[in-house]
Protein backbone atom coordinates (compact mmCIF):
# COMPACT_ATOMS: atom_id res chain seq x y z
CA UNK A 1 0.00 0.00 0.00
CA UNK A 2 2.82 2.39 0.83
CA UNK A 3 4.51 1.78 -2.50
CA UNK A 4 1.25 2.32 -4.39
CA UNK A 5 0.64 5.53 -2.45
CA UNK A 6 4.12 6.81 -3.30
CA UNK A 7 3.62 5.97 -6.99
CA UNK A 8 0.29 7.79 -7.05
CA UNK A 9 1.86 10.83 -5.37
CA UNK A 10 4.77 10.88 -7.84
CA UNK A 11 2.35 10.61 -10.76
CA UNK A 12 0.26 13.48 -9.42
CA UNK A 13 3.34 15.65 -8.96
CA UNK A 14 4.68 14.83 -12.41
CA UNK A 15 1.32 15.65 -13.96
CA UNK A 16 1.16 19.03 -12.25
CA UNK A 17 3.36 20.76 -14.82
CA UNK A 18 1.16 19.53 -17.66
CA UNK A 19 -2.00 20.60 -15.85
CA UNK A 20 -0.56 24.05 -15.22
CA UNK A 21 0.26 24.48 -18.90
CA UNK A 22 -3.16 23.21 -19.97
CA UNK A 23 -4.87 25.75 -17.72
CA UNK A 24 -2.68 28.63 -18.93
CA UNK A 25 -3.22 27.58 -22.56
CA UNK A 26 -6.98 27.43 -22.05
CA UNK A 27 -7.20 30.86 -20.43
CA UNK A 28 -4.46 32.75 -22.28
CA UNK A 29 -3.56 30.70 -25.35
CA UNK A 30 -5.37 32.88 -27.90
CA UNK A 31 -3.70 36.09 -29.07
CA UNK A 32 -5.32 39.10 -27.41
CA UNK A 33 -6.54 41.20 -30.34
CA UNK A 34 -7.65 44.06 -28.07
CA UNK A 35 -3.99 45.02 -27.55
CA UNK A 36 -1.67 46.54 -30.16
CA UNK A 37 1.78 48.12 -30.26
CA UNK A 38 2.24 51.77 -29.46
CA UNK A 39 2.69 53.79 -32.63
CA UNK A 40 4.13 57.22 -33.21
CA UNK A 41 3.50 59.49 -36.16
CA UNK A 42 6.42 61.08 -37.97
CA UNK A 43 5.21 64.52 -36.95
CA UNK A 44 5.06 63.74 -33.24
CA UNK A 45 6.98 66.03 -30.93
CA UNK A 46 8.36 65.53 -27.45
CA UNK A 47 5.44 67.43 -25.95
CA UNK A 48 2.72 65.40 -27.64
CA UNK A 49 0.63 62.62 -26.10
CA UNK A 50 2.35 60.24 -28.48
CA UNK A 51 5.86 60.59 -27.09
CA UNK A 52 6.32 60.43 -23.34
CA UNK A 53 8.89 59.17 -20.80
CA UNK A 54 8.60 55.59 -19.56
CA UNK A 55 7.56 56.73 -16.07
CA UNK A 56 4.36 58.26 -17.52
CA UNK A 57 2.95 54.80 -18.36
CA UNK A 58 1.17 51.96 -16.62
CA UNK A 59 2.83 48.75 -17.83
CA UNK A 60 1.08 45.39 -18.16
CA UNK A 61 3.39 43.14 -16.14
CA UNK A 62 3.61 39.63 -14.68
CA UNK A 63 5.25 38.58 -11.41
CA UNK A 64 7.27 35.35 -11.61
CA UNK A 65 6.13 35.17 -15.20
CA UNK A 66 7.23 31.56 -15.76
CA UNK A 67 5.19 30.25 -12.83
CA UNK A 68 1.99 28.43 -13.67
CA UNK A 69 1.05 27.54 -10.11
CA UNK A 70 2.29 28.05 -6.56
CA UNK A 71 5.76 29.29 -5.64
CA UNK A 72 6.53 26.21 -3.53
CA UNK A 73 6.31 22.53 -4.57
CA UNK A 74 5.28 23.40 -8.10
CA UNK A 75 6.73 23.99 -11.56
CA UNK A 76 7.97 26.79 -13.78
CA UNK A 77 7.54 26.56 -17.54
CA UNK A 78 8.05 28.40 -20.80
CA UNK A 79 4.41 27.77 -21.74
CA UNK A 80 3.33 30.29 -19.09
CA UNK A 81 5.71 32.89 -20.52
CA UNK A 82 4.53 32.24 -24.09
CA UNK A 83 0.86 32.53 -23.12
CA UNK A 84 1.44 35.81 -21.26
CA UNK A 85 3.22 37.26 -24.29
CA UNK A 86 0.12 36.40 -26.34
CA UNK A 87 -1.89 38.53 -23.89
CA UNK A 88 0.37 41.52 -24.53
CA UNK A 89 2.26 41.37 -21.22
CA UNK A 90 5.57 43.26 -21.61
CA UNK A 91 6.83 43.70 -18.05
CA UNK A 92 8.37 40.34 -17.10
CA UNK A 93 9.55 39.61 -13.56
CA UNK A 94 11.92 36.69 -12.97
CA UNK A 95 13.52 35.12 -9.91
CA UNK A 96 17.02 34.04 -10.94
CA UNK A 97 19.19 31.38 -9.28
CA UNK A 98 22.59 29.91 -10.07
CA UNK A 99 22.83 26.21 -10.95
CA UNK A 100 26.06 24.85 -12.43
CA UNK A 101 27.25 28.46 -12.87
CA UNK A 102 24.31 29.19 -15.17
CA UNK A 103 21.40 31.58 -14.53
CA UNK A 104 18.10 29.73 -14.18
CA UNK A 105 14.50 30.71 -13.41
CA UNK A 106 12.72 29.21 -10.41
CA UNK A 107 10.64 30.46 -7.45
CA UNK A 108 10.83 30.30 -3.68
CA UNK A 109 9.10 31.68 -0.60
CA UNK A 110 12.26 32.12 1.48
CA UNK A 111 14.98 34.76 1.25
CA UNK A 112 17.82 32.30 0.82
CA UNK A 113 20.12 32.24 -2.19
CA UNK A 114 20.69 28.50 -1.71
CA UNK A 115 17.04 27.45 -1.73
CA UNK A 116 14.67 27.16 -4.66
CA UNK A 117 11.31 25.58 -3.93
CA UNK A 118 10.12 24.53 -7.37
CA UNK A 119 10.55 20.96 -8.56
CA UNK A 120 12.28 22.19 -11.70
CA UNK A 121 13.97 25.22 -13.22
CA UNK A 122 14.29 26.86 -16.63
CA UNK A 123 17.61 27.92 -18.11
CA UNK A 124 17.60 31.65 -18.71
CA UNK A 125 19.14 30.99 -22.11
CA UNK A 126 15.85 29.28 -23.02
CA UNK A 127 13.94 32.31 -21.74
CA UNK A 128 16.03 34.58 -23.97
CA UNK A 129 15.40 32.35 -26.99
CA UNK A 130 11.66 32.45 -26.29
CA UNK A 131 11.66 36.23 -25.98
CA UNK A 132 13.71 36.82 -29.12
CA UNK A 133 11.68 34.36 -31.21
CA UNK A 134 8.21 35.16 -29.85
CA UNK A 135 7.98 38.58 -28.19
CA UNK A 136 8.83 40.49 -31.37
CA UNK A 137 6.91 38.26 -33.78
CA UNK A 138 3.40 38.16 -35.19
CA UNK A 139 2.52 35.54 -32.57
CA UNK A 140 1.92 38.38 -30.10
CA UNK A 141 -0.41 41.37 -30.45
CA UNK A 142 2.19 44.08 -29.74
CA UNK A 143 5.54 42.98 -31.22
CA UNK A 144 6.96 46.50 -31.50
CA UNK A 145 6.55 47.39 -27.82
CA UNK A 146 9.51 47.24 -25.43
CA UNK A 147 10.07 44.22 -23.22
CA UNK A 148 11.11 45.04 -19.64
CA UNK A 149 13.01 42.36 -17.74
CA UNK A 150 12.83 42.75 -13.95
CA UNK A 151 15.48 40.42 -12.55
CA UNK A 152 15.50 39.47 -8.86
CA UNK A 153 18.82 37.63 -8.73
CA UNK A 154 19.27 35.22 -5.81
CA UNK A 155 22.97 34.51 -6.16
CA UNK A 156 26.41 35.96 -5.45
CA UNK A 157 28.15 33.55 -7.84
CA UNK A 158 30.23 35.84 -10.04
CA UNK A 159 30.93 33.10 -12.58
CA UNK A 160 27.18 32.88 -13.13
CA UNK A 161 27.05 36.64 -13.70
CA UNK A 162 29.85 36.36 -16.23
CA UNK A 163 27.93 33.65 -18.10
CA UNK A 164 24.79 35.78 -17.82
CA UNK A 165 26.60 38.70 -19.45
CA UNK A 166 27.64 36.48 -22.36
CA UNK A 167 23.99 35.54 -22.91
CA UNK A 168 23.02 39.20 -22.97
CA UNK A 169 25.90 39.99 -25.32
CA UNK A 170 24.49 37.44 -27.76
CA UNK A 171 21.31 39.55 -28.11
CA UNK A 172 22.96 42.98 -27.84
CA UNK A 173 21.13 44.14 -30.97
CA UNK A 174 17.88 43.82 -28.97
CA UNK A 175 19.21 45.69 -25.92
CA UNK A 176 19.25 49.44 -25.30
CA UNK A 177 22.87 50.07 -26.24
CA UNK A 178 25.86 51.84 -24.68
CA UNK A 179 24.12 55.20 -24.18
CA UNK A 180 21.91 53.55 -21.55
CA UNK A 181 24.51 51.31 -19.87
CA UNK A 182 25.61 51.12 -16.22
CA UNK A 183 22.23 52.30 -14.90
CA UNK A 184 22.12 55.07 -17.51
CA UNK A 185 25.17 56.87 -16.10
CA UNK A 186 26.27 60.20 -17.53
CA UNK A 187 29.82 61.17 -18.56
CA UNK A 188 30.65 62.03 -14.93
CA UNK A 189 29.58 58.58 -13.74
CA UNK A 190 26.35 59.78 -12.13
CA UNK A 191 23.34 57.46 -12.28
CA UNK A 192 20.45 59.08 -14.13
CA UNK A 193 16.73 58.39 -14.09
CA UNK A 194 16.05 55.88 -16.87
CA UNK A 195 12.33 56.40 -16.27
CA UNK A 196 12.69 59.81 -17.92
CA UNK A 197 13.88 58.25 -21.19
CA UNK A 198 11.28 58.61 -23.93
CA UNK A 199 9.50 55.34 -24.60
CA UNK A 200 9.97 55.82 -28.35
CA UNK A 201 13.70 55.09 -27.79
CA UNK A 202 12.77 51.65 -26.45
CA UNK A 203 10.51 50.35 -29.20
CA UNK A 204 11.51 46.83 -30.23
CA UNK A 205 14.12 46.67 -27.46
CA UNK A 206 14.64 44.78 -24.19
CA UNK A 207 15.14 46.93 -21.09
CA UNK A 208 17.11 45.34 -18.24
CA UNK A 209 16.09 46.22 -14.66
CA UNK A 210 17.87 44.46 -11.76
CA UNK A 211 16.82 44.38 -8.11
CA UNK A 212 19.51 46.29 -6.19
CA UNK A 213 18.83 44.52 -2.90
CA UNK A 214 21.57 42.20 -4.21
CA UNK A 215 24.46 44.42 -5.33
CA UNK A 216 26.68 41.60 -6.60
CA UNK A 217 28.31 42.65 -9.89
CA UNK A 218 26.54 46.03 -9.95
CA UNK A 219 29.90 47.77 -10.09
CA UNK A 220 32.04 49.57 -12.67
CA UNK A 221 35.32 47.90 -11.76
CA UNK A 222 34.35 44.23 -11.53
CA UNK A 223 34.43 43.16 -15.18
CA UNK A 224 37.28 40.73 -14.53
CA UNK A 225 35.09 38.74 -12.13
CA UNK A 226 31.60 39.50 -13.48
CA UNK A 227 32.11 40.04 -17.16
CA UNK A 228 30.15 42.91 -18.68
CA UNK A 229 26.98 42.22 -16.70
CA UNK A 230 26.64 45.73 -15.23
CA UNK A 231 27.08 47.27 -18.67
CA UNK A 232 23.75 45.78 -19.73
CA UNK A 233 21.81 47.11 -16.71
CA UNK A 234 19.63 50.09 -17.63
CA UNK A 235 17.97 50.60 -14.25
CA UNK A 236 17.75 49.05 -10.79
CA UNK A 237 14.78 48.58 -8.49
CA UNK A 238 15.05 49.08 -4.73
CA UNK A 239 16.93 52.23 -5.71
CA UNK A 240 16.52 56.00 -5.90
CA UNK A 241 14.70 55.94 -9.22
CA UNK A 242 12.62 52.77 -8.85
CA UNK A 243 10.93 51.20 -5.84
CA UNK A 244 10.03 47.52 -5.47
CA UNK A 245 6.97 47.34 -3.21
CA UNK A 246 4.85 44.46 -1.96
CA UNK A 247 1.14 45.10 -2.31
CA UNK A 248 0.58 45.50 1.44
CA UNK A 249 3.12 48.34 1.47
CA UNK A 250 1.17 50.03 -1.33
CA UNK A 251 -2.34 49.38 -0.04
CA UNK A 252 -1.57 50.45 3.54
CA UNK A 253 0.93 53.22 2.85
CA UNK A 254 0.75 55.95 5.49
CA UNK A 255 1.84 58.57 2.97
CA UNK A 256 -0.17 58.06 -0.25
CA UNK A 257 0.54 61.59 -1.47
CA UNK A 258 4.28 60.98 -1.14
CA UNK A 259 3.98 57.78 -3.19
CA UNK A 260 1.95 59.57 -5.85
CA UNK A 261 4.45 62.42 -6.02
CA UNK A 262 7.42 60.07 -6.17
CA UNK A 263 5.81 58.16 -9.04
CA UNK A 264 5.41 61.32 -11.08
CA UNK A 265 9.05 61.07 -12.20
CA UNK A 266 10.47 57.96 -10.51
CA UNK A 267 8.98 54.47 -10.91
CA UNK A 268 7.55 51.65 -8.81
CA UNK A 269 6.99 47.98 -9.53
CA UNK A 270 4.14 46.63 -7.42
CA UNK A 271 4.22 42.89 -6.71
CA UNK A 272 2.06 40.43 -4.73
CA UNK A 273 2.67 39.81 -1.04
CA UNK A 274 4.98 37.01 0.07
CA UNK A 275 3.78 33.43 0.36
CA UNK A 276 3.42 30.23 -1.64
CA UNK A 277 0.06 31.24 -3.13
CA UNK A 278 -0.59 34.94 -2.43
CA UNK A 279 -3.65 36.81 -3.59
CA UNK A 280 -3.43 39.11 -6.56
CA UNK A 281 -2.94 42.79 -5.82
CA UNK A 282 -5.58 45.26 -6.89
CA UNK A 283 -4.21 46.93 -10.00
CA UNK A 284 -6.84 49.66 -9.56
CA UNK A 285 -5.40 50.59 -6.15
CA UNK A 286 -1.85 50.55 -7.53
CA UNK A 287 -2.85 52.71 -10.50
CA UNK A 288 -4.51 55.26 -8.20
CA UNK A 289 -1.13 55.75 -6.50
CA UNK A 290 0.78 56.09 -9.77
CA UNK A 291 2.50 52.67 -9.66
CA UNK A 292 3.76 51.91 -13.16
CA UNK A 293 4.62 48.19 -13.33
CA UNK A 294 1.49 46.30 -12.28
CA UNK A 295 2.90 42.80 -11.71
CA UNK A 296 0.06 40.28 -11.45
CA UNK A 297 -0.17 36.53 -10.86
CA UNK A 298 -1.89 35.53 -14.09
CA UNK A 299 -2.13 31.87 -13.05
CA UNK A 300 -4.62 32.99 -10.38
CA UNK A 301 -7.58 34.07 -12.49
CA UNK A 302 -9.63 36.32 -10.23
CA UNK A 303 -11.47 39.63 -10.24
CA UNK A 304 -8.23 41.61 -9.88
CA UNK A 305 -6.61 39.98 -12.90
CA UNK A 306 -9.80 40.43 -14.93
CA UNK A 307 -10.07 44.11 -13.93
CA UNK A 308 -6.44 44.67 -14.90
CA UNK A 309 -6.91 42.94 -18.26
CA UNK A 310 -10.05 44.97 -18.92
CA UNK A 311 -8.19 48.21 -18.17
CA UNK A 312 -5.42 47.51 -20.69
CA UNK A 313 -7.84 46.08 -23.27
CA UNK A 314 -9.94 49.24 -23.11
CA UNK A 315 -6.81 51.36 -23.50
CA UNK A 316 -5.72 49.16 -26.40
CA UNK A 317 -2.07 49.03 -25.31
CA UNK A 318 0.17 47.30 -22.77
CA UNK A 319 1.68 50.73 -22.07
CA UNK A 320 -1.19 52.97 -20.97
CA UNK A 321 -0.59 56.66 -20.30
CA UNK A 322 -1.23 57.65 -16.72
CA UNK A 323 -3.80 60.46 -16.25
CA UNK A 324 -2.45 64.00 -16.18
CA UNK A 325 -3.05 64.37 -12.45
CA UNK A 326 -0.58 61.52 -11.77
CA UNK A 327 2.13 62.86 -14.06
CA UNK A 328 4.53 65.72 -13.27
CA UNK A 329 2.70 68.94 -12.50
CA UNK A 330 3.87 71.53 -15.00
CA UNK A 331 3.28 75.13 -13.93
CA UNK A 332 3.20 77.54 -16.87
CA UNK A 333 3.96 81.14 -15.96
CA UNK A 334 2.73 83.90 -18.27
CA UNK A 335 5.28 86.16 -19.91
CA UNK A 336 5.98 89.16 -17.66
CA UNK A 337 4.28 92.47 -18.44
CA UNK A 338 6.59 94.93 -20.22
CA UNK A 339 7.71 97.40 -17.59
CA UNK A 340 7.55 101.21 -17.81
CA UNK A 341 11.18 102.48 -17.95
CA UNK A 342 10.14 105.56 -15.97
CA UNK A 343 9.43 103.33 -12.98
CA UNK A 344 12.84 101.64 -13.07
CA UNK A 345 15.00 101.42 -9.93
CA UNK A 346 18.10 102.09 -12.02
CA UNK A 347 20.30 105.03 -10.99
CA UNK A 348 19.19 108.29 -12.57
CA UNK A 349 20.43 111.88 -12.45
CA UNK A 350 18.27 114.59 -10.91
CA UNK A 351 19.46 118.18 -11.29
CA UNK A 352 18.28 121.75 -10.82
CA UNK A 353 19.73 125.27 -10.89
CA UNK A 354 21.86 124.66 -7.77
CA UNK A 355 22.21 120.84 -7.54
CA UNK A 356 22.91 117.64 -9.44
CA UNK A 357 22.29 114.29 -7.75
CA UNK A 358 22.57 110.64 -8.79
CA UNK A 359 19.73 108.75 -7.13
Regions found by a protein language model. Name each.
Residues 1-91, 98-359:
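Long, acidic (Asp/Glu-rich), low-complexity accessory segments flanking structured domains
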Amino acid sequence: GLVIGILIFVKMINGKATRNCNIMDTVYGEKNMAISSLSFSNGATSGSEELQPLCYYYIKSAYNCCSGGNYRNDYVSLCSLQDLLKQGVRGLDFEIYSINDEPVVATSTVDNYCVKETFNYIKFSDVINTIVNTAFSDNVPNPNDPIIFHLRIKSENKTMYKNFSQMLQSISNRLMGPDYSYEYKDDQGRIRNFGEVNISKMMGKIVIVVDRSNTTCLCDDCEEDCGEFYEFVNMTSNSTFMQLLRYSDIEYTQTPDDLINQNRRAMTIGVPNKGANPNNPSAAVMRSLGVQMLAMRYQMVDANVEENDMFFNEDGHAFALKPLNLRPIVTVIDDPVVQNPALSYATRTVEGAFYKLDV
